[in-house]
Amino acid sequence: MAEVETFLFTSESVNEGHPDKLCDQISDAVLDACLAEDPDSKVACETCTKTNMVMVFGEITTKANVDYEKIVRDTCRGIGFVSNDVGLDADHCKVLVNIEQQSPDIAQGVHGHFTKRPEEIGAGDQGHMFGYATDETPEFMPLSHVLATKLGARLTEVRKNATCPWLRPDGKTQVTVEYHNDNGAMVPIRVHTVLISTQHDETVTNDEIAADLKEHVIKPVIPEQYLDENTIFHLNPSGRFVIGGPHGDAGLTGRKIIIDTYGGWGAHGGGAFSGKDPTKVDRSGAYIARQAAKSIVASGIARRCIVQVSYAIGVPEPLSVFVDTYGTGKIPDKEILEIVKENFDFRPGMIIINLDLKRGGSGRYLKTAAYGHFGRDGADFTWEVVKPLKWEKPSA
């Protein structure tokens, strides 16, 4: 029997204490606070951080009474940044705020200063967004991305529940998976390499770090069937990672857009998600495109699917919709495109209604800002709901 041809593909993740992810979470916590009191809030909130300082800035038009400084400190504290030696002290760091109103030029073009009906609301900006799905995992997400993301989440879990008390908030993960290409569908064979770099305190040895990471992080996350004697482990390969968080590196909202999406699979239009209200199609367009791609794969029409949608500022209807099933479709892609167009409304105002995207509060968007926006469980992730598709099945 001929040996199966394989290839390697790698995805990375960072956990919630990474400086860029800290910024994503603060930006989305601000969005949550605005939407909780005023669902029509227009929010474009950026965050940056460096040693002993967090700044939030951008354009926000809202009736909500928002205490920006409290949101910053609460978010940092929730992640675990409670003293300078872990990278940031939530209660004593400088918090700078520079927020202005949304430009009236943008407001009149997008929502007519709140006068337009939902179906008339224009895209908040130009751009193109992608949604992707694959049948290789129950989440309809790439395995390399799922494992890297879950390792990051598990690192945080064992830090917060004190299983590994030497852990500090900052950390990164990376997983290389060996795949077989089955006529366009991706079939994971094994995990080739696992890389974890995590911030730690002064007391722990590198041997203890490696042993704890294998036992408490890798074992519970990566299914046994994917690990073998040839799997390579790089556990804190730099040898020392005591200084971390904003003390180690500056952080900025929107710097982790591949981690937020599909781990390098599919494609990305370049627009970040966090800190943006749903009239920003960077966010809402990517969410509806994911629902469309996932619904196609979950319905069995294709094993793998990417959907692209594009917009012009102020125009409700998308400029283009594109579908590619990588040769895995049971019917031609042009027919699948028609199914997508018939079953999904890509106008921003209608996406907002159909996915209930004005609902903030209860940390809804904050939850999305670490460990990925897609392949997640829970009622808040409305774009992960598989939509039953109306289509004429070909007769056998």
Swiss-Prot record:
Function of the molecule: Catalyzes the formation of S-adenosylmethionine from methionine and ATP. The reaction comprises two steps that are both catalyzed by the same enzyme: formation of S-adenosylmethionine (AdoMet) and triphosphate, and subsequent hydrolysis of the triphosphate.
Cellular compartment(s): Cytoplasm
Record flagged with keyword Lyase: no
PROSITE patterns in alphabetical order: ADOMET_SYNTHASE_1, ADOMET_SYNTHASE_2
Name of the coding gene: SAM4
PANTHER family cross-referenced by the UniProt entry: S-ADENOSYLMETHIONINE SYNTHETASE
One GO term of the biological process aspect: one-carbon metabolic process
Keywords: ATP-binding, Cobalt, Cytoplasm, Magnesium, Metal-binding, Nucleotide-binding, One-carbon metabolism, Potassium, Transferase
NCBIfam families registered for this protein in UniProt: metK (TIGR01034)
GO molecular function: ATP binding; metal ion binding; methionine adenosyltransferase activity
InterPro entries (alphabetical): ADOMET_SYNTHASE_CS (IPR022631), S-AdoMet_synt_C (IPR022630), S-AdoMet_synt_central (IPR022629), S-AdoMet_synt_N (IPR022628), S-AdoMet_synthetase (IPR002133), S-AdoMet_synthetase_sfam (IPR022636)
Catalytic activity: L-methionine + ATP + H2O = S-adenosyl-L-methionine + phosphate + diphosphate
CC annotations in GO: cytoplasm
Pathway: Amino-acid biosynthesis; S-adenosyl-L-methionine biosynthesis; S-adenosyl-L-methionine from L-methionine: step 1/1
Cofactor note: Binds 2 divalent ions per subunit. The metal ions interact primarily with the substrate. Can utilize magnesium, manganese or cobalt (in vitro).
Protein name, entry field: S-adenosylmethionine synthase 4
Residues the entry annotates as binding ATP: 18, 170-172, 238-241, 249, 255-256, 272, 276, 280
Subunit structure: Homotetramer.
Similarity section: Belongs to the AdoMet synthase family.
